[in-house]
Design a protein with these regions (language model features):
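Short, low-complexity N-terminal intrinsically disordered segments enriched in polar/charged residues
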Residues: 1-34, 132-134
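Short secondary-structure boundary/capping elements
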Residues: 20-23, 51, 97
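A short gly/proline-enriched turn/hairpin at secondary-structure junctions
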Residues: 31, 35-47, 58-62
Length: 134
């Protein structure tokens, strides 16, 4: 049964990845419970689909050709760890970026993300946007 759960979660994560690549922030938010939350790098949580749509749109606006790939998906201590890589061109500077990070999901009874805590190296992203080599 655990294998079936991971198969279902991997399918869910694959569709979530495609939603990010589809440049439709509202579609990304549909993977969250109506009162779900997304917290990025310990910041203020985006709570509810409208707020999550706005958060996703921020990335999509900053990187109009954004592509996300799923690097790994594991279950650990009751959480689902979704590891990803984002590649894209920063809209204002024209600089290409590539960052990796992860989200720690708590999946609700409805099969949607109830809570997501995301993390990536924001300083590295800023260096790439500014064009610094180190």
């Amino acid at each position: 049964m655990a294998q079936d759960r991971m198969t279902q979660l991997r399918d869910f994560a694959t569709r979530y990845t495609a939603a990010w690549c589809g440049q439709d922030a509202g579609n990304v938010s549909k993977f969250f419970a109506p009162s779900g939350s997304l917290t990025i790098n310990g910041g203020t949580p985006s709570v509810g689909r409208s707020a999550i749509t706005q958060a996703a749109q921020g990335f999509m606006t900053a990187f109009p050709d954004l592509k996300v790939s799923m690097d790994d998906l594991v279950e650990k201590q009751g959480k689902i760890l979704y590891h990803w890589t984002l590649e894209g061109t920063h809209g204002e500077t024209g600089r290409r970026v590539r960052i990796s990070g992860f989200e720690s999901w708590r999946i609700g009874e409805d099969g949607l993300i109830a809570e997501s805590f995301g993390n990536f190296d924001a300083a590295d992203l800023e260096r790439q946007i500014k064009g610094a080599d180190s």
